Amino acid sequence: MLHTPIGRLRTMGFIEGMSLLILLFIAMPLKYWAGLPLAVTIVGSVHGGLFILYLLVLAYATFSVKWPLKWSAAGFIAAFVPFGNFLYDRGLRNYK
């Protein structure tokens, strides 16, 4: 899966998507319900780094595959929506 630019993007999208879900559904409740703001600090920092890495891999895939702008824009928007990367991955799975 890591042998192609799209495979790398799919892998990074999964990792970044999981970090967003961990931030939203584990770290945020720990901050507000359990009074542990350090959880958001740590997970948020990791997620931020993964998000930047995801954008770099998205740019790499965009220029390597030379696909239309709509695929790049969809990948960018999907990164901001919970479960968005997983839906985007469904489209990438069938991309030739």
UniProtKB/Swiss-Prot annotation:
Q: Name the residues that span the membrane.
A: 14-34, 38-58, 67-87
Keyword Transmembrane carried by entry: yes
Q: List the InterPro entries.
A: DUF3817_TM
Chief location? membrane
Naming one, the record's GO cellular component terms include: plasma membrane
- List locations, semicolon-separated: Cell membrane
Key words, A-Z: Cell membrane, Membrane, Transmembrane, Transmembrane helix
Q: List the disulfide bonds.
A: none
What Pfam family is a match for this entry? DUF3817
Annotated membrane topology is:
Multi-pass membrane protein
Supply the PANTHER family for this chain: MEMBRANE PROTEIN, MEMBRANE PROTEIN-RELATED
Protein's recorded name: Uncharacterized membrane protein YdzA
In the UniProt record, the gene name given for this protein reads ydzA
